[in-house]
Amino acid sequence: MIEFEPKYITFDCYGTLTKFRMADMTREMFGNVLQGDDLEKLVAFYAGYRRDEVLGAWKPYRDVVVNALRRACKRMNVEFNEVEAEKIYTAVPTWGPHPDVPEGLSRLAKKYKLVILSNASNNQIQSNVDKLGAPFHAVFTAEQAQSYKPRMQGFEYMFDQLNCNPEDVLHVSSSLRYDLMTAHDLGIKHKAFVKRGHEPSTPYYQYYEVNDIPHLAAELGL
């Protein structure tokens, strides 16, 4: 059980709540030119370059998505098509939640104020949020904060907007590298790692582990 009453439960969205399909779309897009291990290398390089693209000054999410794929294609010596790359970006608002999410969030929303902090575009995120099946107190984007996670600025922006402190929230994510390592460094004591399979558990960062969002609700007594 989680023996803590947060003022807010703050969530990462893409990957944690929304089923993030960039790897799937990359496989579909390049499956005719790469196979097996080479295709998976491209997928992995694309993920890595996306992380690298968000570490500097803020830029539109479209540029993050497209630039990272351009770099991954160069690394794998395959042809890059910017029009095709933009299709990945434009698909983002069509993606819905992991199957467990609506039930779990609905249970949590009966008691807690739910908040999203997402590496998202302002003009895309609401479409994803509308598919989650529960009300949110606030939704904050990297575009609003002018900074992407894992940089700290987005978290600091969220705390300022909510008029709260790191100690007041339970932050929930399926990503150590984008969220929970930064949350640890910011002094967010209460964190939950949702085991979606993108990253291995790293207990050093001191979080609760849950299998899905209903499991999180159960750990909070709901």
Language-model region placement:
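Charged catalytic carboxylate motif
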Residues: V64, A68, D100, G104, ...
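N-terminal helical cap/lid subdomain that shapes the substrate entry/recognition surface
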Residues: I2-P99
